[in-house]
């Protein structure tokens, strides 16, 4: 059973990346994170949402991105879900510096950033049916 949970859904406009980042940060604030911890979460969410918009929906603004977040004791689990084009090769996509959109001058560091700032990263994707990125982080909660 979770201590708390939330979900939000928004259209795949790049302007909504900031909204997603702040909404998740506000939800996580109940764990009384440090500035560094909250920035880690915001950065990882930003990368995942940006991936959904740029890669999943190929910058189309007619898709939906869903975020589900759940707090269990001292850990937050955040899922970023899209119904975009999916990822052909997850292992390749997770390699540092790999990008499927070199035409957009993308750095190919999104998954690496998520792995660096979070405690766990899971990616599930099916070509033509979208992608689900799950990131987790534990906090030093003082009772």
UniProtKB/Swiss-Prot annotation:
E.C. number: 2.7.11.1
Keywords: ATP-binding, Kinase, Nucleotide-binding, Serine/threonine-protein kinase, Sporulation, Transferase
EC primary class: transferase
Role, per record: Binds to sigma F and blocks its ability to form an RNA polymerase holoenzyme (E-sigma F). Phosphorylates SpoIIAA on a serine residue. This phosphorylation may enable SpoIIAA to act as an anti-anti-sigma factor that counteracts SpoIIAB and thus releases sigma F from inhibition.
PANTHER family in the cross-refs: ANTI-SIGMA-F FACTOR RSBW, ANTI-SIGMA-F FACTOR RSBW-RELATED
Cross-referenced HAMAP family: Anti_sigma_F (MF_00637)
Protein name as it appears in the record: Anti-sigma F factor
Taxonomic lineage: Bacteria, Bacillati, Bacillota, Clostridia, Eubacteriales
Gene: spoIIAB
């Amino acid at each position: 059973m979770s201590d708390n949970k939330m979900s939000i859904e928004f259209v795949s406009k790049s302007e909504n990346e900031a909204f997603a980042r702040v909404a998740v940060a506000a939800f996580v604030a109940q764990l009384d994170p440090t500035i560094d911890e909250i920035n880690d979460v915001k950065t990882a969410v930003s990368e995942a949402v940006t991936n959904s918009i740029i890669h999943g929906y190929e910058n189309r603004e007619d898709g939906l991105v869903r975020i589900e977040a759940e707090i269990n004791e001292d850990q937050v689990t955040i899922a970023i879900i899209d119904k975009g084009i999916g990822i052909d090769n997850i292992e390749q996509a997770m390699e540092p510096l790999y990008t499927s959109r070199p035409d957009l001058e993308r750095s190919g560091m999104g998954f690496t950033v998520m792995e660096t700032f979070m405690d766990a990263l899971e990616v599930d994707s099916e070509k033509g049916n979208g992608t689900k990125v799950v990131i987790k982080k534990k906090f030093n909660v003082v009772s």
